[in-house]
A protein has these predicted regions:
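Beta-strand-rich ligand-recognition modules
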Residues: 184-278
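Active-site-adjacent beta->alpha loops and helix N-cap segments on the catalytic face
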Residues: 28-42
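Short beta-strands within extracellular/lumenal beta-sheet-rich domains
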Residues: 147-170, 227-231
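Extended extracellular/luminal ectodomain segments enriched in beta-structured repeat modules
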Residues: 167-180
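Active-site clefts of carbohydrate-active enzymes
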Residues: 39-68
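Substrate-binding cleft of secreted/luminal carbohydrate-active enzymes
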Residues: 18-29, 54, 63-127
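Short edge beta-strand/loop segments characteristic of extracellular beta-sandwich folds
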Residues: 160-162, 178-184
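Short, well-ordered coil/turn segments that N-cap beta-strands
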Residues: 15-16, 44-50, 82-84
Length: 287
């Protein structure tokens, strides 16, 4: 409606065979939690299909396009919302060039099967614009990240998760679940940050810090500088199936530093074992 289109009227009159839902107009960055509720409501009681489109632009130093785990996360969320289909909505899809590699064939093979996706590794992330993608002119179309982090002002982010982690934990299939929050320009030892998942404070006993200040890789210096706050989640802190809320609060900041802080990335990674008691490296280093 923002663009002046009467989509609901077209659907009711049977003029539309399907709606392809995207997180942006074109070249959208990775969004593993595209909300299909409005489209499902619009098409309820009609023959119009709801298809979930996935943009693979990641705009990050490590990966320019979505990893297989991100694709699986987005596909699983689409199926969980009863989408009629899920597809890659880019002009072309060659993450590692042409021809496709076995990694790509494995990634694409799973996206149509909720059963295969259920215990596929996932990488969920809050959509982030990143340094290479300009702001979106469409009202409401700009991604949630990055966001300025001010002292005492909580930031809350929605994170949609398709996994039934309680079920798979009980079956011995969950290897680990990790929540990562990347904050730019911050020095962790001089500033107090609190992270919550569904209003549950994640304690320092779960925290692993990753310093991105003056880090060099084979692809050049890591930027922007800052820290990643990574939490290894125990079962009683697992995200729930469906909507989750990640809250980031700067409790106290170093008064001697005037640089603005930003929440740059929010990621949740789920790693599965292929079956109970399965070790990925059964022989260890010696083998």
């Amino acid at each position: 409606k923002t663009l002046g289109y009467e989509v609901d009227v077209w659907v009711r009159e049977g003029l539309v065979d399907g709606l392809i839902c995207l997180s942006g107009l074109t070249n959208a960055t990775v969004d593993t939690g595209l909300d299909l509720a409005s489209a499902k409501e619009t098409t309820a009681g009609t023959d119009c299909l709801v298809l979930s489109g996935f943009g693979q632009s990641l705009a990050r130093q490590t990966d320019h396009q979505a990893t297989p785990e991100m694709v699986w996360a987005a596909a699983a969320n689409a199926h969980a919302q009863a989408a009629d289909g899920f597809g890659l909505a880019d002009a072309c899809t060659f993450p590692d060039g042409w021809p496709w590699t076995p990694t790509q064939y494995d990634a694409w093979r799973r996206i149509g099967s909720p059963e295969l996706l259920a215990t596929s590794d996932k990488h969920y992330r809050v959509q982030s614009r990143g340094p290479r993608v300009p702001p979106v002119w469409l009202p409401g179309g700009d991604p949630p990240l990055p966001r300025a982090l001010e002292e005492g002002e909580p930031l809350e982010f929605r994170l949609m998760v398709a996994d039934d982690l309680d079920r798979w934990q009980e079956a011995g299939r969950v290897e680990w679940v990790r929540l990562k929050v990347r904050i730019t320009a911050i020095e962790a030892s001089l500033n107090e940050v609190e992270v919550r998942l569904n209003n549950q404070v994640l304690g320092d006993d779960l925290l692993l810090l990753n310093d991105y200040t003056y880090r060099l890789t084979s692809k050049g210096p890591v930027n922007p500088y800052g820290f990643v706050y990574e939490f290894v989640l125990p079962p009683d802190c697992f995200p729930r199936e469906g909507d989750n809320r990640v809250t980031v609060i700067l409790r106290q900041r170093d008064r001697k530093i005037s640089l603005p802080f930003e929440v740059y990335d929010v990621d949740l990674e789920v790693r599965y074992q292929q079956h109970g008691n399965y070790q990925r490296n059964p022989l260890g280093r010696a083998g």
